[in-house]
Amino acid sequence: MTWHPQANRLKTFVLLVGMSTLIVVVGAIFGRTALFFATLVAVGINVYTYYNSDKLALRAMHAQPVSEVQAPVMYRIVRELATGAHQPMPRLYISDTNAPNAFATGRNPRNAAVCCTTGILEILNERELRAVLGHELSHVYNRDILISCVAGALAGVITALANMAMWAGTFGTTRDEENPFALLLVSLLGPIAATVVRLAVSRSREYQADESGAMLTGDPLALASALRKISSGVQAAPLPPEPQLASQAHLMIANPFRVGDRIGSLFSTHPPIEDRIRRLETMVAGR
């Protein structure tokens, strides 16, 4: 099985360059001291998130560890996929919710955890479940948690500096008092630009995990079928639109909120299900 570390490194590099440029531009308003403290806070938060990503996500979903006796099919599938990829066996969890979804978390394969909801276990057959688990394991093998935290750290710096710009513009404490429009522009467009980059990277991660997972299982159409069921299931039984759950939504295999929910749109980091299905079907057609 061939993963895509080069593609992930390229995305990380582009992300660093683009967001770092924004940081330099925004930080130039205040000088080195403000830039230093904004960077320190944002990086600190995301380093903590990186090392505790599994705990944060599992806690938000009220997930419980399961044994092989409790979830024999899930264990068998994950063990087969991990063995085929020459990777260690992750910890397995189940979240007792009707919302059909799954996610993987952990900073590397040795610290990985995979969680399925009871809802997804009820609606998928074994072939589809295998495809979903292959997708989730691919996120771990592709080091997507690292990319998310890099994006989060840089976006956090930009947002913090933009907030400073707004505050300074309000109270007139910036040395750029001659151009208040520049402050307004920076405070508004900085966070928007950071969000756009984060969403682009996140959507790219989902496409990549679809492809890698389909290659791991050898069954792209099973994942396409699973995505159809999950999409319909989410509309019938979405997760409640709570901020704690929204902060972990990017880890899910599909947007866990009902289409049209304000919070679902605000925190959506997933490409359209139809596009993902189309790409998977193209993989089969191109064989």
Swiss-Prot record:
Its main location: membrane. Zn(2+) binds at residues 135, 139, 206. InterPro entries: HtpX_protease (IPR050083), Pept_M48_protease_HtpX (IPR022919), Peptidase_M48 (IPR001915). GO terms for biological process: proteolysis. GO terms for molecular function: metalloendopeptidase activity; zinc ion binding. It is a multi-pass membrane protein. PROSITE patterns: ZINC_PROTEASE. Keywords: Cell membrane, Hydrolase, Membrane, Metal-binding, Metalloprotease, Protease, Transmembrane, Transmembrane helix, Zinc. Its EC number is 3.4.24.-. The chain crosses the membrane at residues 10-30, 33-53, 145-165, 181-201. Binds 1 zinc ion per subunit. It comes from the Bacteria. Its cofactor is Zn(2+). GO terms for cellular component: plasma membrane. The active site is at residue 136. The keyword Iron does not apply. Belongs to the peptidase M48B family. PANTHER family: PROTEASE HTPX. This is Protease HtpX homolog. It comes from Mycobacterium leprae (strain TN). The lineage of its organism: Bacteria, Bacillati, Actinomycetota, Actinomycetes, Mycobacteriales.
